[in-house]
Amino acid sequence: MDNYLQQILNHKRFGIGIVSSGTTGEPKLIWRSPDNLRACNEVAIHAQQLTSKSKVLTVTKTDHAGGLLLQTLPAYTLGCKVIDVEKFNAFNFLKKIKGYTHTFLTPEQMKAVMMTKGFKDCDLSGIRILGGSNPVSWEIIEAFVSKGALVQHNWGMSEIGPMVINIEIDSIEHIEYLKQRTPKSYTILGNAYWCDWKIVDHELYVKSDMCIEPGWFATGDIVALDMGKRMYYKGRK
């Protein structure tokens, strides 16, 4: 991985292909240049407060944007001493996660962890759990926050960057506050924007250095805003 990282950082014409998750269509290979990877890295580091002392556990596929670009590659560029990449196992996850500060889970993985025997009495204090790839329900967010975790609901796409809009949720009171403001049939996207954005006929458009193409990208996602400029997701166009 160290040699792989140096190629990304030092070679102008080098790039890597990331497999899209397939949530918005057929999975495809997305090519990212070194400059694009740097942009994704910078946002991931700042948005998640990653430092050289962070300890990252990756349990998602590293050929996908979520598995590689959200935490794993940023942690390597920071020189983190503890970075482990493992195949996801819901039963083992709770036993191991206490030694880490950051991880990323899909909603399906979060549900699987919730169903394990150990979840009822687990303590996730001091752990930032990034949740995304698909919308994360309030029920799931509340379950993990009630165990002490900071849940960072994250929205991104393979084409526009892994971490584009998100929100940190660390208390039941915050959840109740947000639930009261969530429009019917919508789920939370976030209130922290790491891109330029606009809404045209209810569809979200974004633009940033993390996008694989210049200019405005039509996401195909139908969204809404509340008075506090928090964004919510309804579904695909």
Identify the residue ranges that each predicted region occupies.
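Short beta-strand->loop structural element characteristic of the AMP-binding/adenylate-forming
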Residues: 1-6, 28-31, 80-88
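Conserved AMP-binding A3 loop
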Residues: 15-42
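Conserved pre-ATP/AMP-binding loop-to-beta segment of ANL
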Residues: 2-19, 49-55
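Conserved ATP-binding/catalytic segment of the ANL
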Residues: 187, 198-199, 203-237
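Conserved AMP-binding/adenylation subdomain of ANL enzymes
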Residues: 39-55, 63-102
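Gly/Ser/Thr-rich phosphate-binding loop
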Residues: 102-105, 114-182
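Short Gly/Pro-enriched turn/cap motifs at secondary-structure boundaries
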Residues: 184-191
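Active-site glycine-centered loops adjacent to acidic/histidine catalytic or metal-binding residues
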Residues: 23, 133, 156, 221, ...
